[in-house]
């Protein structure tokens, strides 16, 4: 696999790139569907929840807090606003559990970061500011990164803003992430390079058509990353 050249900054996504996140959300959703089983089957609950999440994104953004509000809103709708307060409290507790994720680094992450310490390493992730900073501290990885930027969404505009903040040309920045839609495509669009590291589970909002590109490499394990530089 051809190596990248003239890279000064390596930006890492956080959730499902540095640590596991989506599997915890999926587990909460399964337990949520059990609570709502008197009102609808699991597929209906999940489909309606996704619709509520999507409609709330412009106001609430991403992350555990936004997800919790969507859980409650969807539950009230599906139950015809008849759900017992005790069940609403159970749902709130489920959502709050996502704010206490262990953020244990995925296998190979620490080794890859150690091998890349000669580069300027940054975190570029979307979500809720306090939640993401808290997870980074719990992960024990914060010492590897000179900059952390949390955005409401990853777009060409926010990617260019990151480059301006870091005072780096897009062509000298490499993005590493698990979401083709959020991590890879916007960076390629502005002239940066990218390494795609798919995770075993992906939130359906992140599903998109993938494509080949001369500035893109795909690896199956983040431990393979240092060999590309």
Provide a role label for each language-model segment.
Residues 1-7, 86, 110, 114, ...:
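Asp-based, Mg2+/Mn2+-dependent phosphohydrolase catalytic module
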Residues 38, 50-97:
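A metal-dependent, Asp-based hydrolase signature
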């Amino acid at each position: 696999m051809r190596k990248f050249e003239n890279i000064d900054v390596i930006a890492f996504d956080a959730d499902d790139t540095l640590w596991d996140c989506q599997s915890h959300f999926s587990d909460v959703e399964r337990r949520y569907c059990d609570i709502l089983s008197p009102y609808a089957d699991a597929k209906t609950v999940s489909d309606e929840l996704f619709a509520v999440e999507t409609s709330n994104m412009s106001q609430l953004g991403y992350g555990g807090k936004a997800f919790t509000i969507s859980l409650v809103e969807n539950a009230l709708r599906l139950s015809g606003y008849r759900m017992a307060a005790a069940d609403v409290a159970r749902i709130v507790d489920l959502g709050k559990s996502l704010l206490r994720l262990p953020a244990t680094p995925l296998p190979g992450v620490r080794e890859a970061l150690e091998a890349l310490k000669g580069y300027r390493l940054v975190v570029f992730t979307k979500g809720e500011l306090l939640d993401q900073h808290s997870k980074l501290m719990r992960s024990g990885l914060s010492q590897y990164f000179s900059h952390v930027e949390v955005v409401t969404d990853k777009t060409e505009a926010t990617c260019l803003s990151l480059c301006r903040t870091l005072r780096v040309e897009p062509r000298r920045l490499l993005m590493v992430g698990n979401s083709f839609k959020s991590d890879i495509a916007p960076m390629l669009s502005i002239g940066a390079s990218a390494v795609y590291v798919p995770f075993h589970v992906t939130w359906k909002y992140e599903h998109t058509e993938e494509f080949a590109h001369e500035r893109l490499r795909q690896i199956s394990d983040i431990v393979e990353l240092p060999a590309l530089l």
